[in-house]
Curated annotation (Swiss-Prot):
Cited function: Part of the AP-3 complex, an adaptor-related complex which is not clathrin-associated. The complex is associated with the Golgi region as well as more peripheral structures. It facilitates the budding of vesicles from the Golgi membrane and may be directly involved in trafficking to the vacuole. Required for the transport via the ALP pathway, which directs the transport of the cargo proteins PHO8 and VAM3 to the vacuole.
Domain of life: Eukaryota
Species in which this protein is naturally found: Saccharomyces cerevisiae (strain ATCC 204508 / S288c) (Baker's yeast)
Modified residues (N-acetylthreonine): T2
Keywords per UniProt: Acetylation, Coiled coil, Cytoplasmic vesicle, Golgi apparatus, Membrane, Phosphoprotein, Protein transport, Repeat, Transport
Coiled-coil segments: 858-878
Identification of the protein by name: AP-3 complex subunit delta
Note: Present with 13500 molecules/cell in log phase SD medium.
Length: 932
């Protein structure tokens, strides 16, 4: 028989807990369970549901140990994405525990959950105030736990309520509490800057603390605050400088150097005082971190001027030593400082060319990527080829790292290949083009070599995904053709090789636009233009619409220069090429791109006229091909013009492009006149034709067949038309059916077979008449150099000068541009790790104001607003009264005045005094009413 007073299962658990017997799953059991159920997502999800159900039951338990265990497990589960905001009140209960271990768990959970719920922080404020008071009940560790937890859940309202308690803790006798309070104040200042303004002296006094850890915490907090707003800390420069001179703690010295870096950016006067001390510190210390921060302070703090070579050499010599270090991190950050010094003045780093070239072959690709940014500062005529050769080898050769393993006696080596990422290859191509073309190719003394480099880059860029490199390579070919006249034959030979390469057409089509433009613009250099035309038209399937736009005019230019190099035996070839071009442009005239379609139709009509004239003219070339066609393109030779020149041209401010020349009525009237003139001309032509028939044809004397056989030359109108046809080359004469049919037919079979043969050789017109055919498949440009003989420098044309116009309007030709390079707005789907702060734009103009004074000023502002509202009400009443007086006697106006709520006597007295001291209210209200 069971007793009524037998203990239950819960009572037994409670009795066994003091002896170490726990029946709930601990955090360790939870982790083991997750690992054991991690086979499939379904099993893991089922396990999580079971654990969450158990935690919900445990967290509602009256036993604080069980509640703490559940909160700890929920804190761990939050990392898997399970929200724990529903148990915030239970977390608050655990935080209020007097046991140290339970309080730690509570503050840990609060740091992960309370920031989502601002209401729970109102309940936690009193608990935080209680835990922050150091007395006999609270030991040092509990206060430290509260300070650490406070910094993670701080909000503006909580910071305002807790700031005074934290400043009180700065006077604690325990250095540990003072240090923790200073670090907690950092988050308070970010959310509530008024606390720093009102208690600035109390906070700064900790820089003179007896304990070095407290001073270190104060310097660190000031350093971090100066990143947000350095202005209020400039007045501390003498005190901070004194600490820098006297202290021997390297950590504090580093923090002070970082702090002076931020301050000197807004206060240039600090340079004269700080620079000698920092240079002295660099010479006296052996600590690598201090030396690096000293150089960083000089560079980032704007202390290094463009003409200060002595300071620059002192910094660069130290960085040179770091670059020889075995530590890759030290080499990397040294390259960063090298680059920043080079941006100030490139002459500073010009003497370190050998070091930078060596860094270009570093085993760490990230160091290579930083070293390649330094190349532009060291390049000259002497080392350009060495730099380009070093970079080009990295495209082809596979670098390896030899890793030594094993003991000294039996030493083994392992070869690890260095994988070059694609972004580094893209960077190399851009740098090679940039350093070679800089300052109008001033560093290039061998343009045959540079032609070969550009050709190799075009071949290497086929496997790179960034196809914009092809456009840059094409621009280099174009610049060489325009700016280096003596190398045009070599350059155009390389261009012909490129467009004849099917791999280039398929994998790097972006290089074709500029290359095809060069072939058209400088087609006088090509002797057999008919073969070049066949090459260009055969690859039409690879050309994009932008390339087709350039191709149309390029083909016409090549044809014009080739056919005008006229020989008697070329007449048939000219006719065949002309037919091929007409057929080619007929296909392009149906393009989906309007620009291609328009250009094709324009050229097609002209070539059809030229073909008609060529068939009619049996002696030589017709005037359309010999004079008219070359005049389209040979008026003048193009000169090099710098990019952006168009924006410098003068813009007429009086130019109106909006107002039409004719009004709508005038335009309609003009159109009506044109229609009437056209109708009258048509009627006159019809009447004249009837008169001619009556005059020259007699039905009684002539039969129908004889009428048809009348000689046209007896008709005076036909004679006039024939004269006009002979004198006007643009006259569209009638064609018989056979001629029209032949002009629209394709080429004969034999001609097609001959045209399908790909030309093997493109011959160039050389000035010395010593022409050697260039085989596209086998021949290469010879680059023989005589030893011991310096090659004469070729002439490079400079850009044409442009007279700069007066300052234009800001909105004139202003292109839309993106600001994402400077300001990258955070996407909504990304985690924002940036700490929210109100310190950046806070005004620290009034230092030392107490919080009471701030509240008083706030009350005065409220009273001032109430006075303004009262005056506005009086003004409205007077306006209504004036309107009522102006109304007639028959009209009735009812004004309902609401009863005003009772105000403080202080506000009433203030209103009376203000009314006494102010000018007459009637005049003020009268002025206000007139404004209204």
């Amino acid at each position: 028989m069971t007793s009524l007073y037998a203990p239950g299962a819960e009572d037994i658990r409670q009795r066994l807990r003091p002896f170490g017997f726990f029946f709930e799953k601990s955090l360790k059991d939870l982790i083991k369970g997750i690992r054991s159920h991690n086979e499939t997502p379904e099993k893991l999800d089922q396990f999580f549901k079971q654990v969450l159900s158990e935690c919900r039951e445990e967290v509602n338990s009256p036993d604080l140990n069980s509640k703490t265990n559940a909160v700890l497990k929920l804190t761990y589960l939050e990392m898997y994405g399970f929200d724990m905001a529903w148990c915030n009140f239970h977390i608050l209960e655990v935080m209020s525990s007097n046991k140290l271990q339970q309080k730690r768990v509570g503050y840990l959970a609060a740091s992960q959950s309370f920031y989502k719920d601002s209401d729970i922080l109102m309940l936690a404020t009193n608990l935080l105030k209680k835990d922050l008071k150091y007395d006999g009940n609270n030991d040092v560790v509990k206060v430290g736990i509260a300070l650490s937890g406070l910094s993670t859940i701080i909000t503006p309202s909580l910071a305002r309520d807790i700031a005074d308690d934290l400043f009180t803790m700065l006077n604690s006798t325990r250095p540990y509490i003072r240090k923790k309070a200073i670090t907690a104040l950092f988050k308070v200042f970010l959310q509530y800057p008024e606390a720093l303004r009102d208690n600035f002296d109390k906070f700064v006094s900790k820089l003179d603390d007896d304990d070095i850890s407290v001073v270190s915490a104060a310097v660190s907090v000031i350093c971090e605050l100066s990143k947000k707003n350095p202005q209020p800390f400039i007045q501390l420069s003498p005190l901070l400088y004194e600490i820098l001179v006297t202290i021997d703690n390297n950590w504090i010295i580093i923090r002070l150097l970082k702090l002076f870096t931020n301050l000197s950016q807004v206060e240039p006067k600090l340079r004269a005082k700080l620079l000698p001390k920092i240079l002295e510190l660099m010479e006296s210390t052996v600590a690598t971190s201090v030396i690096y921060e000293s150089v960083n302070c000089i560079v980032k703090g704007n202390m290094l001027e463009e003409d200060d070579f002595e300071t620059a050499m002192a910094c660069l010599e130290r960085l040179h030593t770091f670059c020889d270090s075995q530590d890759p991190n030290l080499r990397y950050i040294s390259c960063i400082l090298f680059y920043k010094i080079g941006k100030i003045n490139t002459d500073f780093i010009s003497r370190f060319d050998q070091l930078i070239i060596r860094l270009l072959s570093d085993v760490d690709v990230s160091i290579r990527s930083k070293a390649i940014e330094l190349v532009e500062g060291i390049v000259d005529e002497d080392n350009l080829k060495a730099i380009v050769q070093t970079l080009m080898k990295q495209f082809v050769d596979e670098d390896v790292v030899i890793l030594q393993t094993g003991s000294i006696v039996y030493e083994k080596s392992k070869r690890i290949p260095i994988i070059i990422p694609e972004n580094y290859k893209i960077k190399m191509v851009n740098v090679i083009i940039s350093i070679c073309s800089a300052d109008n190719y001033s560093s290039v003394n061998d343009f045959e070599w540079y032609n070969a480099v550009i050709m190799d880059l075009a071949m290497l860029c086929q496997d790179i995904s960034d196809k914009s490199l092809g456009s840059k390579i094409g621009e280099q070919f174009r610049n060489l053709m325009i700016k280096v006249p003596s190398m045009r034959e070599v350059t155009i030979a390389n261009i012909i090789k490129l467009i004849s390469n099917d791999n280039i057409n398929k994998q790097l089509p972006t290089v074709l636009r500029e290359c095809i433009w060069c072939l058209g613009e400088f087609s006088t250099l090509v002797e057999n233009g008919n073969d070049l035309i066949k090459i260009m038209t055969e690859n039409i399937s690879y050309y994009s619409h932008s390339v087709q736009e350039v191709l149309i005019l390029a083909l016409v230019k090549v044809f014009s220069n080739w056919c005008n190099n006229f020989q008697e035996d070329k007449r048939f070839e000219i006719k065949m090429v002309l037919k091929e071009l007409i057929e080619f442009f007929e296909n392009l005239s149906y393009s989906s791109t309007f620009e291609v379609q328009e250009r094709s139709v324009e050229v097609l009509e002209f070539l059809r006229l030229s073909l008609e004239a060529l068939e009619e003219d049996t002696e030589g070339l017709p005037m359309l091909l010999s004079e008219v066609l070359p005049s389209f393109f040979n008026a003048y030779e193009l000169a090099p013009i710098a990019r952006g020149t168009q924006l410098k041209l003068a813009v007429d401010e009086n130019l109106d492009l909006e107002t039409p020349f004719l009004t709508k009525e005038a335009a309609d009237e003009l159109l009506d006149e044109q229609k009437s003139d056209a109708i009258s001309d048509l009627m006159s032509d019809i009447s004249m034709d009837e008169q001619v028939e009556l005059k020259f044809v007699d039905d009684s004397d002539t039969s129908y067949e004889e009428k048809e056989k009348l000689d046209d030359f007896e008709n005076p109108f036909e004679i006039e038309r024939e004269k006009e046809r002979m004198s006007n080359p643009y006259y569209l004469g009638e064609e018989d059916e056979e001629r029209t049919k032949n002009s629209k037919d394709l080429l004969d079979l034999n001609e097609e077979e001959s045209s399908d043969k790909k030309p093997e050789t493109i011959r160039l017109n050389r000035t010395d008449n010593s022409l050697n055919s260039l085989s596209l498949s086998t021949t290469e440009i010879s680059r023989k150099k005589k030893k011991g003989k310096k090659k004469n420098r070729v002439q490079v044309l400079s850009d044409e000068p442009v007279i700069e116009a007066a300052p234009k309007r800001k909105d004139a030709f202003q292109k839309p541009h993106d600001n994402h390079s400077t300001q990258n707005p955070l996407k909504k789907d990304k985690i924002n790790l940036r700490m929210h702060s109100q310190l950046e734009n806070f005004d620290f103009s009034n230092f030392g104001q107490s919080s009471n004074a701030g509240r008083g000023s706030q009350e005065e502002g409220n009273l001032r607003k109430e006075d303004e509202l009262e005056l506005s009400r009086l003004e409205a009443n007077l306006i209504v009264k004036d309107e009522k007086d102006n109304l007639s006697d028959t009209e009735e106006v009812i004004v309902i005045k609401k009863k005003k709520k009772g105000k403080k006597s202080k506000s009433k007295n203030k209103l009376k005094t203000k009314a006494k001291n102010s000018p007459e209210p009637n005049e003020f209200l009268r002025d206000q009413s007139t404004d209204i």
